[in-house]
Amino acid sequence: DIDAVDFSMMLASAFEKAGNLLSANMYWPYDMMVEFAEANPEAVRKLFRMLYNENIPLAERYAAFREGFEGYAKPLGKKHYQDLHAISVYLSFEYPEKYFIFKMKIFSIFRKRVGYAVEKTKQQSSVWKVEIYTQMCQLILDEVQKDSELIQMSKNRLDDSCYQDEAYHLLTMDIVFFGGMYM
């Protein structure tokens, strides 16, 4: 709830179960997000409103979000860790039917294993990797939607306490993750 009275507490609670998606060895976007939200909740609320505004191109939202966190972290001699992966987590949690969680290493390995070609151009946006990843995931999703047996298997593994993944984005990300890690 972006309009929550205690925004920093709501934000911490909303992402606390993201686990290793937002915290890992020497990678702390969750901690920095919470720290900044506690210090200046209205600034962070404004950054999330802008990040979630689908009328603004993703590259602009990403740059402005990072700049906002940079303005907080740099004077403290800290890193903000708000990279493409963290942004993709925030967007996927807000719009799970539209976004896929991006992890560069997994994407790179998976695309090489399946022969997904990436054409590099001189005019690439700051989010071109996420855009290419999304295109690849959409191709996978198109195939997933044709496989009724796979869809039923996925539905059977989700109980009432789970997000039901009606758009099959989590299933698609599972395919990419396991294909990148274990194929």
Give the residues covered by each predicted segment.
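An N-terminal alpha-helical hairpin/helix-loop-helix interaction module that forms a charged
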Residues: 1-80, 96-183
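Contiguous, well-ordered alpha-helical segments that form the cores/surfaces of helical PPI scaffolds
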Residues: 86-94, 108
